[in-house]
């Protein structure tokens, strides 16, 4: 019985290590794509962002994150309003992450530890970014769905991007009585300002 139990634990361990390496390799490739875009002086700022936005949209669970962040306003919205909101949120997310990664593009980084949250079926990958003044840790939360990996959250110094966005959006939604359609107008204007700031 002990041998069987040990063998089972060994299989789980080997399986996680293989999967963990797959996730780390995948994530590292996507990070390199983003950082390389910023370091490419032949690309305009606009083209850099569009390239990064495409990478983020393909690899982040944008729709699921958008729904979570919308909170109670989601249920009362029409299908058309929801689709508009998801599109706006994905751009908002891309602008936020692009702005953050732009600040790190000239710094060295290393993917360090990885662990698996069995309960939530999520892999957590720690990334350390080094600068002259010290280092900062980012934790990527990655989930596999339909044989693909998707980032479902980003923790900067243990602060969740998704939870922060939900709190931020809730404050903004309050001002429009949790009307997602009205909120879309505000989000669209905010995206336009962030976009102009990023590409100029």
Predicted regions and their residues:
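Low-complexity, intrinsically disordered terminal/linker segments enriched in charged
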Residues: 156-200
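Surface-exposed, charged secondary-structure patches
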Residues: 95-139, 190-200
């Amino acid at each position: 019985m002990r041998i069987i139990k040990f063998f089972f634990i060994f299989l789980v361990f080997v399986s996680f290590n293989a999967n963990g390496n797959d996730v780390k390799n995948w994530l590292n490739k996507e990070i390199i794509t983003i950082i390389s875009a910023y370091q490419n002086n032949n690309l305009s700022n606009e083209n850099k962002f569009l390239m990064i936005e495409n990478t983020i949209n393909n690899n982040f669970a944008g729709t699921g994150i958008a729904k979570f962040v919308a909170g109670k306003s989601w249920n009362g919205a029409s299908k058309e309003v929801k689709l508009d909101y998801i599109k706006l949120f994905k751009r908002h997310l891309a602008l936020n992450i692009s702005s953050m990664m732009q600040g790190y593009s000239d710094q060295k980084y290393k993917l360090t530890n990885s662990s698996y949250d069995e309960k939530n079926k999520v892999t957590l990958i720690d990334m350390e970014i080094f600068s002259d003044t010290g280092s900062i840790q980012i934790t990527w939360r990655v989930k596999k769905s339909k044989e693909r990996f998707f980032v479902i959250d980003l923790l900067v110094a243990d602060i969740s991007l998704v939870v922060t966005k939900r709190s931020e959006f809730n404050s903004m939604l309050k001002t429009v009585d949790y009307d997602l359609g009205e909120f879309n107008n505000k989000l669209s204007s905010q995206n336009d300002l962030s976009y102009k700031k990023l590409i100029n």
